[in-house]
From Swiss-Prot:
The keyword Magnesium does not apply. Gene3D superfamilies: Tetratricopeptide repeat domain. This is Pentatricopeptide repeat-containing protein At5g16640, mitochondrial. One of its GO terms (cellular component) is mitochondrion. NCBIfam families: PPR. Keywords: Mitochondrion, Repeat, Transit peptide. The lineage of its organism: Eukaryota, Viridiplantae, Streptophyta, Embryophyta, Tracheophyta. Residues 1-43 form a transit peptide. It comes from Arabidopsis thaliana (Mouse-ear cress). PPR repeats lie at residues 45-79, 80-114, 115-149, 150-184, 185-219, 220-254, 255-289, 290-324, 325-359, 360-394, 395-429, 430-464, 465-499.
Amino acid sequence: MRRSISSKAKSFLHRNLLYSGNSGTSPSSSFSICGFCFSRRAYSNGSDYREMLRNGIRFMKLDDSLDLFFHMVQCRPLPSIADFSRLLSAISKMKKYDVVIYLWEQMQMLGIPHNLCTCNILLNCFCRCSQLSLALSFLGKMIKLGHEPSIVTFGSLLNGFCRGDRVYDALYMFDQMVGMGYKPNVVIYNTIIDGLCKSKQVDNALDLLNRMEKDGIGPDVVTYNSLISGLCSSGRWSDATRMVSCMTKREIYPDVFTFNALIDACVKEGRVSEAEEFYEEMIRRSLDPDIVTYSLLIYGLCMYSRLDEAEEMFGFMVSKGCFPDVVTYSILINGYCKSKKVEHGMKLFCEMSQRGVVRNTVTYTILIQGYCRAGKLNVAEEIFRRMVFCGVHPNIITYNVLLHGLCDNGKIEKALVILADMQKNGMDADIVTYNIIIRGMCKAGEVADAWDIYCSLNCQGLMPDIWTYTTMMLGLYKKGLRREADALFRKMKEDGILPNECYV
């Protein structure tokens, strides 16, 4: 028999609502969706909506779901709360969490009752929207209304904490939950193990695995995948392979996610041949590689200038019906640009729009850098203009890439215009930006202007780094200003920045 949860739950809520700083927020104060237009689709009788919920709900689009909701609230007698729960759950699976919250509020206004199931759906939507303060506030409301939280309720909250990088709060709630007499299931353990692994706390995750097994809960493929991914991310390659052996001995077989984690680790460590071996092992096990598998392998091949093989892999994935996304395209375009085959990259860039793949900031930035390195600045600037025209927002890396290209080619005035535009658009320059400008000015012999930029850094709230000092000192030396360069060297050491090998 579980002990009453009210006192412990309330103390937990108080602690966490204070943390989030939003204890008084109600669901409706943060979420409202205006302007939903419900088309009045004709339903011949009350059984039609039940037929839709029973057989057609998996294939429904959002508009159809909204039409169905509108019809259901018009029915007399009203459909059961179980029917409403089924519909809300389906919309939640579409990841339209804000819509679920809105519809739940409409149900409240219409006096449609709720149960634990509908409450759990709403609470999960708050967590998925990263609105943990609202989720905790709503948990308090649930308890007041007499709905005792279930293991599903806690699962949603734990997932919300882990997704919000609040794994310690997740562990605290886990302990409170166990203290109240709830028995965690494999899903609960998996949620926290995954959160710990993503927070680089793999040893704690392994401890929790031991605790899980002592509690008589057997790990599944999801448990092992989280641990293998965490071990790989922490560079513990041998531990990861041992974990694979361990799961296989228990007759828990690796899936596509497992192999993707191993391939990712191999590629990051430069062990592309081993990554290919894992890929071949997948094929032997009759596992279909997914877009992540292919993208990782293409990245590894491009990294080692094996472009012909990367192209072949790209073509092969398409032939298998696995169509590349923006990430895959960007990887291969980057491979071409780094191998000085920027025109091949441009061809792929054009192919993206033909295939309906939307280019993102990374794609544009890669191509701009490719043309800058090829000395084709006019093309790079044109791509930048097209990017802005298409509504794709340049980030600081995009600006720095373009500025680097302009400064390297002696176009300092144009670089300063771009810098001014960037600041006008609300983008704050970072120390890398100013290092690029200082380097460009020094290279062009405009050391006095570079010095002015250097002196303005404090006013911009920026601290010079090793590259700022290095570049500025080189510029001063080249101008014969040795005394000024030596003074700057001393200033650098006073600031606690150690000289690199170029200046020792």
